[in-house]
């Protein structure tokens, strides 16, 4: 890793900014605040007027919680809403078709604006719709879960699951802007909240150990969703990811570090039939990757025990029983059937990730047995 990169990250992270600008072909802002009403400022910044035609798309769970807020927006702006059934199992072509039909029936045009209000599933689906409807319309992303606020809302990856394979169909498409209010997290159930903490720890392991130290020292305040703790975590993770994607937007090399824990994590999600959530699965995947890093790079074993201890404090799982290794290996290797080795992101040390490290089946099974199984 470049020392210049880390100097930039630390310099920016210590800033107290509430607006982050993501550079690239289509520059956009991320607004971060506790106050939901700051959304109106973002609308003003982007010259969105009360008569601008907008279509708000969410899921039934978010809609039931924020129905009154949505009605308030509708009283000010020209907004029509649509919601679909909550859950990863609905991140499908069928749901996309429902959204396309809604837009067509309401005569959405090229100059219409689509608003995604919800977690990662909503953001991914709506982003894909925006990228394809009439060859591309503007959209605004308003993430409501910790996982979507710190990770999936930035980076341009949009898409849907196909035949059980996560994000098999997708594209890169940036929003007009992202609006984040940590107040959304106050209504998030504990399961979904801790789901995001797995990804927070990932950023700490691959990029900035200070995040891990912060959570270790403040875990009670984090779990109680204290506003200053949530702002620190959200802003820090977003600035770290911003730096990564600006260096490798199309995920051709360096950005691959963000997949730490995901190789095993995706297999856990698939074989558990989504009973293990994404953040939990990534957390488990990181434990396996730490064990592999011990075997391959001689990574200090104390880091594994440190993470295991932190997981338990945060309510994250440390075990997952793999009953069918053949099925599990197929889930890992579904798109690389003709290769014997699987590529991993591993750690030489904290903040020192290595990408595209090939690991054979025997090494993977050994690491699983010594860690999560």
Swiss-Prot record:
It comes from the Bacteria. NAD(+) binds at residues 120-124, 144-145, 157, 166, 184-187. Zn(2+) binds at residues 199, 262, 278. It comes from Clostridium tetani (strain Massachusetts / E88). Its main location: cytoplasm. InterPro entries: Dehydroquinate_synthase (IPR050071), DHQ_synth_AroB (IPR016037), DHQ_synth_fam (IPR030963), DHQS/DOIS_N (IPR030960), DHQS_C (IPR056179). This is 3-dehydroquinate synthase. It catalyses: 7-phospho-2-dehydro-3-deoxy-D-arabino-heptonate = 3-dehydroquinate + phosphate. The gene is aroB. One of its GO terms (cellular component) is cytoplasm. Keywords: Amino-acid biosynthesis, Aromatic amino acid biosynthesis, Cobalt, Cytoplasm, Lyase, Metal-binding, NAD, Nucleotide-binding, Zinc. The lineage of its organism: Bacteria, Bacillati, Bacillota, Clostridia, Eubacteriales. Binds 1 divalent metal cation per subunit. Can use either Co(2+) or Zn(2+). Pathway: Metabolic intermediate biosynthesis; chorismate biosynthesis; chorismate from D-erythrose 4-phosphate and phosphoenolpyruvate: step 2/7.
């Amino acid at each position: 890793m470049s020392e210049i990169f880390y100097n930039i990250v630390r310099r920016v992270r210590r800033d107290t900014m509430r607006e982050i600008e993501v550079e690239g072909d289509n520059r956009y802002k991320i607004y971060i605040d506790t106050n939901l009403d700051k959304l109106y400022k973002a609308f003003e910044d982007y010259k969105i007027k009360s008569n601008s035609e907008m279509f708000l798309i969410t899921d039934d769970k978010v809609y039931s919680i924020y129905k009154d807020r949505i009605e308030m927006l509708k009283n000010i702006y020209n907004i029509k809403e649509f919601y679909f059934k909550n859950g990863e199992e609905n991140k499908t072509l069928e749901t996309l078709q429902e959204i396309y039909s809604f837009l067509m029936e309401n005569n959405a045009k090229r100059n219409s604006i689509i608003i995604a209000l919800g977690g990662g599933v909503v953001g991914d689906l709506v982003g894909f719709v925006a990228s394809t409807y009439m060859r591309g319309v503007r959209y605004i992303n308003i993430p409501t879960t910790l996982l979507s606020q710190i990770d999936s809302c930035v980076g341009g990856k949009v898409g849907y699951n196909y035949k059980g394979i996560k994000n098999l169909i997708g594209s890169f498409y940036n929003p007009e802007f992202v609006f984040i209010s940590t107040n959304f997290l106050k209504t998030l159930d504990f399961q979904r909240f801790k789901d995001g903490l797995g990804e927070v720890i990932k950023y700490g392991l691959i990029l900035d150990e200070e995040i891990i130290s912060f959570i270790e020292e403040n875990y009670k305040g984090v779990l109680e969703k204290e506003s200053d703790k949530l702002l620190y975590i959200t802003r820090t993770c977003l600035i770290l990811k911003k730096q990564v994607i600006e260096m490798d937007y199309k995920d051709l090399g360096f950005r691959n570090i963000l997949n730490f824990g995901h190789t095993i994590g995706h297999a856990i999600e698939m074989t558990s039939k989504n009973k293990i959530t994404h953040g939990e699965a990534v957390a488990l995947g990181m434990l396996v990757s730490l064990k592999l890093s011990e075997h391959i790079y001689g990574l200090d074993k104390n880091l594994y025990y440190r993470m295991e201890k932190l997981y338990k404090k945060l309510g994250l799982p440390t075990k997952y029983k793999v009953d069918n290794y053949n099925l599990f290996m197929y889930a890992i290797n579904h798109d690389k059937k003709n290769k014997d080795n699987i590529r991993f992101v591993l750690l030489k040390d904290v903040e020192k990730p290595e990408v595209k490290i090939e690991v054979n089946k025997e090494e993977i099974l050994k690491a699983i047995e010594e860690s999560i199984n």
